[in-house]
């Protein structure tokens, strides 16, 4: 018996050789077609792993220091409480100023209403702004309780005014619009 010609062992090297050639052809073809994409993907994955591992170690280190240091936790809580107290004091001061302004505005409004009522009782204009104009001019009349009659004025429009007919005078009169396109061009 020969060692190299046994019936079960003779086919094995040929099958391994065919498998090796098949694998080499398949991998070689994939690398020749997609080699640059594979290389670029590996580089991107490498940098992502580096970035994520750095972030992960930083996060783990920060959680260790915050959890293990109770004095720091107490100091932070006290600082937060002090900041809240300071903001609350400021808010209370602003609310107090707002209330004072509202009271002043209400008092001013009440005073104006009283002045308007008094002026209406005297027969004067109810407008407060008119009072400033009247106070600026010296009063010649001794009887201020009797209002002066208004002078006769002509009507603003004629009694037969109709804007559709254009008979009211003036330079502008209504005219119906033209039919057709508003801008030039052929309508062909």
From Swiss-Prot:
<comment type="function">
    <text>Involved in the degradation process of misfolded endoplasmic reticulum (ER) luminal proteins. Participates in the transfer of misfolded proteins from the ER to the cytosol, where they are destroyed by the proteasome in a ubiquitin-dependent manner.</text>
</comment>
<dbReference type="GO" id="GO:0036502">
    <property type="term" value="C:Derlin-1-VIMP complex"/>
</dbReference>
<feature type="region of interest" description="Disordered">
    <location>
        <begin position="116"/>
        <end position="188"/>
    </location>
</feature>
<dbReference type="InterPro" id="IPR009703">
    <property type="entry name" value="Selenoprotein_S"/>
</dbReference>
<keyword id="KW-0963">Cytoplasm</keyword>
<feature type="transmembrane region" description="Helical">
    <location>
        <begin position="29"/>
        <end position="49"/>
    </location>
</feature>
<protein>
    <recommendedName>
        <fullName>Selenoprotein S B</fullName>
    </recommendedName>
</protein>
<dbReference type="GO" id="GO:0036513">
    <property type="term" value="C:Derlin-1 retrotranslocation complex"/>
</dbReference>
<dbReference type="GO" id="GO:0030970">
    <property type="term" value="P:retrograde protein transport, ER to cytosol"/>
</dbReference>
<comment type="similarity">
    <text>Belongs to the selenoprotein S family.</text>
</comment>
<keyword id="KW-0256">Endoplasmic reticulum</keyword>
<keyword id="KW-0812">Transmembrane</keyword>
<dbReference type="GO" id="GO:0030968">
    <property type="term" value="P:endoplasmic reticulum unfolded protein response"/>
</dbReference>
<keyword id="KW-0472">Membrane</keyword>
<keyword id="KW-1133">Transmembrane helix</keyword>
<feature type="compositionally biased region" description="Basic and acidic residues">
    <location>
        <begin position="116"/>
        <end position="125"/>
    </location>
</feature>
<dbReference type="Pfam" id="PF06936">
    <property type="entry name" value="Selenoprotein_S"/>
</dbReference>
<feature type="compositionally biased region" description="Low complexity">
    <location>
        <begin position="136"/>
        <end position="147"/>
    </location>
</feature>
<keyword id="KW-0712">Selenocysteine</keyword>
């Amino acid at each position: 018996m020969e060692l190299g010609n046994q019936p079960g062992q003779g086919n094995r090297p040929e099958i391994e050789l065919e498998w090796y050639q098949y694998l080499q052809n398949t991998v070689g073809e994939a690398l020749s077609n997609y080699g640059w994409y594979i290389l670029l993907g590996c580089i991107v994955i490498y940098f992502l792993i580096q970035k994520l591992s750095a972030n992960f170690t930083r996060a783990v280190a920060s959680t260790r220091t915050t959890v293990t240091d109770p004095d720091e936790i107490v100091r932070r809580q006290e600082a937060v409480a002090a900041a809240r107290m300071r903001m609350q004091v400021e808010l209370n001061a602003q609310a107090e100023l707002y209330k004072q302004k509202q009271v002043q505005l209400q008092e001013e409004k009440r005073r104006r209403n009283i002045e308007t009522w008094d002026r209406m009782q005297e027969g004067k204009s109810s407008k407060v702004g008119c009072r400033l104009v009247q106070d600026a001019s010296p009063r010649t009349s001794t009887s201020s309780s009797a209002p002066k009659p208004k002078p006769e004025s002509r009507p603003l429009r004629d009694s037969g005014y109709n804007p559709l007919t254009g008979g009211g005078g003036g330079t502008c009169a209504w005219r119906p619009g033209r039919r057709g396109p508003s801008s030039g061009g052929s309508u062909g």
